[in-house]
Amino acid sequence: MNEKELIKYFRLLGLEVHTSTKARGHQGFYMRKRIDISKNISQERVIPTLLHEFAHYVHSEIEPFIEKNGGSLEVIFNDSEVTCYEEELLKVTNIVDAHSKCEKLIYHRNIIKNKISEYEKIIKQRYPKFMRSKKFKEFDKYIKKSEARYLLKYDRVKLISGVIFKKSRLLTIDNIEKDFTDMPCEFAAYIRLKSCQKRQGRVSAKINRLKKYYSKPTELFARFVEGLYLAPEQVKNTAPYTYDRFITLLNEGYYPFLKIVINMFLQT
């Protein structure tokens, strides 16, 4: 199977196919019978991406408004019990797209978590009753009179003073001890702890967004179809229940126009 053959078939179905766009920053993008493939992806990713986006089109033919709600596995597999499908499809997704595991982000979050624990230990050496969830009254009393209070909001801030002859002073979270020589080490640790908590929140939010995206039924289905091309035997072994149901529905004609495409690279 080659990409020209695939694109020709898609266009015969009335689909617009573009292979020289930015695809809205993605490898590929499907919307309202239009498939965009990024001009920036490698040649080996073109066919898998075409199949992925075509799977979205097929899904949209059996279930409307998937762009808004992500669709449902109940419709995709014409079954009311979908727990097994979901579990297997998530495993397939991890095979097809390593980014779906969020390993780098989780690793980064764990590093931040360890730093938070280290700063907490420093604080508790002098304030054993300190709790992250409670107000740190001793710190609050000190910080009100210190320019270091700006570091609670920003890791790096430039303070400008003077009306005619302006002076600037750069404060950073890395130079607290140098910039504020009178500050107790426990308070410096608390400022860094609060900074780490903000970073941890941002990383966790990104992980949650990615997991929500990858677990959308339409994305699970698209990566399943993509996986059948990239690693058919591995997909069969990883998702036997889903594969059997998919092949049954495929042969019954449940998925519009998909059987011809699947038969180009897979014996069903």
Describe the function of each predicted region.
Residues 2, 47, 214, 218:
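Hydrophobic (often cysteine-bearing) scaffold residues that line and stabilize catalytic clefts
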Residues 103-268:
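Pan-zinc metallopeptidase signature
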Residues 1-14:
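Zn2+-dependent metallopeptidase catalytic core
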Residues 48-65, 222:
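Active-site recognition of the HExxH zinc-binding catalytic motif
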Residues 17-18:
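Extracytoplasmic and endomembrane cell-envelope/extracellular-matrix remodeling and assembly machinery
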Residues 44, 60-103, 239-240:
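Post-HEXXH active-site segment of zinc metalloproteases
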Residues 31-51:
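Short pre-active-site segment immediately N-terminal to the catalytic Zn-binding motif
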